[in-house]
Amino acid sequence: MKKLTIVCLDADTLGDINLSVFNKFGEFKSYATTKPDERMERLMGADVVITNKVIIDKDVMDRCELKLICISATGMNNVDLEYAKLKNIAVKNVAGYSTNSVVQQTFASLLALLNQIKFYDNYVQSGEWVKSDIFTNLDAPISELAGKKFGIIGLGEIGQKVASVASAFGAKVCYFSTSGANNNAFYERLELDELLKQCDIVSIHAPLNEKTKNLIGERELNLMKNGAILMNFGRGGIVDEGALAKAVDERGLRACLDVLEAEPMLAGHPLLSVKNKNSLIITPHIAWASSEARATLIAKIVQNIENFIKENDGN
């Protein structure tokens, strides 16, 4: 196969990872970000596009001559897959590269909440501990993960590893299968309403699809125990964020979120105005992005391109 022209449309979403490895395939161009009206010009003459969030739709595929679409993520909702198949354009995503990173961030956020890390760090950094008459401070109660009922929504690869870690902490793990097809012998399977009613902690690790969109709304949040913790490390759009903000302030619900329906977060978002700020941890979609995970991601994109070349050798 001839040398390829490869274009990366949103390199900023990959951070400080070195992309020079793609030069070995031919000509490589990289753009920090790409607006919708810049896609056509930048992809003219390109054989391969690397995209994380930039949409590759029918219009792009009709006006450009792409042979391969490399998605620098697991989710594929930014590409019109049916039309790509019709146009005989190969589409490759990357799965499994960020499992350890997401699991680690899940528990980093959860433990920060359970152990009131924000409160106690602020207490010390503000100089209040210096003024104390005793060696400790118990103003914000902390609690253990051991013995808690830990519900997982979406028991895929990440969900299973979260279950394993939660079990190691001594939590009692159960799960709800969003597809309805998962029957795991190691953990108790519950229907969604029962899981929400019973669990002290509920952790979402599901994709966004027709079965999970708006899965957790006001009704579902009201089923949860007062003071329970809801975590979303799956996709925005699964949880009604306005209803969650209300539940945090009115029912003492606590939450750890790494994904929102609109990203970046919108100005005036109800979660920015909650009164119980120590009950809420929000990170900007970083769970996937350890340095190790991003290095693995690039290596797997390279492998996808190499496999494509082998499959089309002689064409």
Positions of predicted regions on the chain:
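N-terminal glycine-/charge-rich "phosphate-binding" loop or analogous flexible N-terminal tail
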Residues: 1-48
